[in-house]
UniProtKB/Swiss-Prot annotation:
It comes from Mus musculus (Mouse). Residues 23-755 are extracellular. The chain crosses the membrane at residues 756-780. It catalyses: L-tyrosyl-[protein] + ATP = O-phospho-L-tyrosyl-[protein] + ADP + H(+). GO terms for biological process: angiogenesis; aortic valve morphogenesis; blood vessel development; branching involved in lymph vessel morphogenesis; in utero embryonic development; lymphatic endothelial cell differentiation; negative regulation of angiogenesis; negative regulation of cell migration. The keyword Metal-binding does not apply. PROSITE patterns: EGF_1, EGF_2, EGF_3, FN3, IG_LIKE, PROTEIN_KINASE_ATP, PROTEIN_KINASE_DOM, PROTEIN_KINASE_TYR. The gene is Tie1. One of its GO terms (cellular component) is membrane. Residues 1-22 form the signal peptide. This is Tyrosine-protein kinase receptor Tie-1.
Amino acid sequence: MVWWGSSLLLPTLFLASHVGASVDLTLLANLRITDPQRFFLTCVSGEAGAGRSSDPPLLLEKDDRIVRTFPPGQPLYLARNGSHQVTLRGFSKPSDLVGVFSCVGGAGARRTRVLYVHNSPGAHLFPDKVTHTVNKGDTAVLSAHVHKEKQTDVIWKNNGSYFNTLDWQEADDGRFQLQLQNVQPPSSGIYSATYLEASPLGSAFFRLIVRGCGAGRWGPGCVKDCPGCLHGGVCHDHDGECVCPPGFTGTRCEQACREGRFGQSCQEQCPGTAGCRGLTFCLPDPYGCSCGSGWRGSQCQEACAPGHFGADCRLQCQCQNGGTCDRFSGCVCPSGWHGVHCEKSDRIPQILSMATEVEFNIGTMPRINCAAAGNPFPVRGSMKLRKPDGTMLLSTKVIVEPDRTTAEFEVPSLTLGDSGFWECRVSTSGGQDSRRFKVNVKVPPVPLTAPRLLAKQSRQLVVSPLVSFSGDGPISSVRLHYRPQDSTIAWSAIVVDPSENVTLMNLKPKTGYNVRVQLSRPGEGGEGGWGPSALMTTDCPEPLLQPWLESWHVEGPDRLRVSWSLPSVPLSGDGFLLRLWDGARGQERRENISFPQARTALLTGLTPGTHYQLDVRLYHCTLLGPASPPAHVHLPPSGPPAPRHLHAQALSDSEIQLMWQHPEAPSGPISKYIVEIQVAGGSGDPQWMDVDRPEETSIIVRGLNASTRYLFRVRASVQGLGDWSNTVEEATLGNGLQSEGPVRESRAAEEGLDQQLVLAVVGSVSATCLTILAALLALVCIRRSCLHRRRTFTYQSGSGEETILQFSSGTLTLTRRPKPQPEPLSYPVLEWEDITFEDLIGEGNFGQVIRAMIKKDGLKMNAAIKMLKEYASENDHRDFAGELEVLCKLGHHPNIINLLGACENRGYLYIAIEYAPYGNLLDFLRKSRVLETDPAFAREHGTASTLSSRQLLRFASDAANGMQYLSEKQFIHRDLAARNVLVGENLASKIADFGLSRGEEVYVKKTMGRLPVRWMAIESLNYSVYTTKSDVWSFGVLLWEIVSLGGTPYCGMTCAELYEKLPQGYRMEQPRNCDDEVYELMRQCWRDRPYERPPFAQIALQLGRMLEARKAYVNMSLFENFTYAGIDATAEEA
């Protein structure tokens, strides 16, 4: 009984048969023996070294994975004849022979399987030809002739599965044919033709082999030409070698073996006295099986007809020039002729064009090719290579083409002694030829000197890589390697131009680096050894802190006192550099303050009457930090000399008279005198009085305190202020102090006594009245506070000043103490009657947001109204008023939440902003996690989110555009996160929540409060310093939130762990659904050094280009083991 096995095993079987086409392996079936008990199969390996202990043994077995029969009556057994031959015996009945047999030989990657298909001699249908080898794209025709006719349909199967059915009347000349058009390699396999309802033992079994390329082609892509295999050889589609039929050998199967011999080198002998008669030879694919050379027929026992030769007698001799046909070898040519048909005349071989001089690098193992032509064609063994020392090398590979034979020689490792003349020799029966060529062995270059340091900065080294070298040129490349001193990390390397200096960038400040050079010359193995190493040290780090000018005071026409400040962070610097630029004259004055703790300096020797631009910057070693915002200072013109002979006289307890003389030789007419008054020993600021009548040289100073000592000095003004006079000291009268003048003394005493009495009475009454008024005012304020909030709010502005807010008809007046003048800030006014409150959108501890319909400029629109609760704290009022100030100053932008207007009603402030119908971005992202909300939808559509990759990237791009606008307006957000981004119409994202924003370049937080730690930059965590660059860090976290669909940053880590690990270089890992380019942008935002983070303009540009690329930068497909990023609401509150 025969039945088909599982077709699932076929790929393993047939793929294995394609491995190692050049393996010398033959499977023989002795068809002369018809008795199953005497039948045997033999597998022979002709591989050199076959049977070594390390190689797997030859295997020969019946392969019932394809065609199965009942197990034989007794087990089959193997008989081994040495290590290279094995025989299978033990068959008991004819059905044991039907099916597929396989022989496996070779080792490692060359392990090869050879197949043989045996048909029953008594079958109903018998194949005209068992093995068919065709090319990819050809038409294959399988033909079975009728051996025992049945009037039933014929079923065709492929690898055991139904393939086609033919009506029994479709037989043509007693044959059933299956035509397969445009066959492909998967079409290979075992085919069978069987009468319907007949025993499978009566089937005709075929084997179809489809080469992986078209006719005459081989290799990957089938772009290489086959060598033109002769005498029925088949070109292997993997390596292009010819698989020769039994009885032939050679690169192109051009040589015939002696009668009765087979194998790749004709080394095997057919058994018995009958020679190869009755034997079927099966070879590695793509050859298949055939009779031996000179035999044909189903049992390979029929000799070839006259004029035919070769395996299965498929070849015709067609001999020319007196040649005779031999059924085993083909045409036997007379002397002077050769070729398949004796069509080629013998001639002396000739070596073709060859380079006269070649160059190799020492230690390499080159391949040298030598091509020759002639009749007969040069073959392997007829071409040799002679070295200068007389050593002869044999070719390792021969490529035969229609007009030439090319031999390839593998040369052992070259030494300098191999330099000299080499010779290629060829010898055939037609003669011999040779050709000499010169080989130059070169030594790769090695630097003799270490690279030189030309310049250095904190993060850069400028290096001259090459001075001199040993060995041979020319220099094709210079590879510079560098790494930190005493470090074990891998060397960093760059390839540079040997004629140019090299700048090593992105180094660590104040760090030693070992720098060395490797040179290369052209050709394989041209890399030389390392040259001497040089130690180079980078400069000190640049100061990162930016000072700001607090004040400057002109103390004279050529003297200027300057004060500045720094953020309260650890100072790394050696001092300060003050720069004054005189633009009119194109001159610069620099003042070096070498004391890093200094915060003030007196600049002298300046040019009077000059406009200066002033800035200050921190320096460290020789490097300058960022300059402060510049200030413009005007020095007055040079003034007159000091007034002369100033003296003072007390007139009473509140009056002192000053007298002086005009300055000598003033520079022009005096316009006025200036008197300076200051309490002696006091800490208060001095006061000044102008004497507008320049002809007067005295003045009575009134309103002074009794019994108080004062200091006075005077200076004149022409076009500029002059020098101060000498300082005089005088005290007012009182408590026994009398005037020096005898006449005015009594008068002054009486007047002083009267005035003291009057002042005492008036002071007592005034104090009583003020006390009563204060009590009444306090009662009124308390009562009004209970009824409603007052209309004045105080908050701390970004500049540190206390600010009072007052509302008056659309003007927000910011009165900043101690400045006496208010600073009005206008905002669009909404009337209370034009606001219709609707639903509560959100609520916090001290504030709430209500959706409302407002009427503005005659149009109704949706708005979000923000307001404080009744018991909000002073800090909440401060932040709320500050947010209105920010919104007013920012203006309009499509990617920020814009101000619609504000309204004051009964002491409450109401701010109307744009309404975002989709809420905040964080909730919007989390709601899109469709695998959690609707798993059936997610699996049906294969997506993890209702949002596309492009929409997520659009959120990030919009947010970057909004932050670019904020940074250009010099506003620091300080709380950028997905919860503070709103989703508006058309799913546009808008930056919101400006309660913590600051309109400054640098802000140092001095107050306590809850901090968004997981979104904060390192410098903000450690030093409470906020800049636009710290907003860039927060944007990187926001980008991570978008990609992770609202995951909690650093989920599973505490704030304390973040404080510890972020400075050590820890960063969030790349989300699995995130493209490398997007994650690289996050990493750029999270760089340690703020100045290395990209500006928002660059971020917005990069995200815009990603949108234009239309690439899926965020993968929302449900890939294997997909999980969402974790969410920890408790951690987000910290």
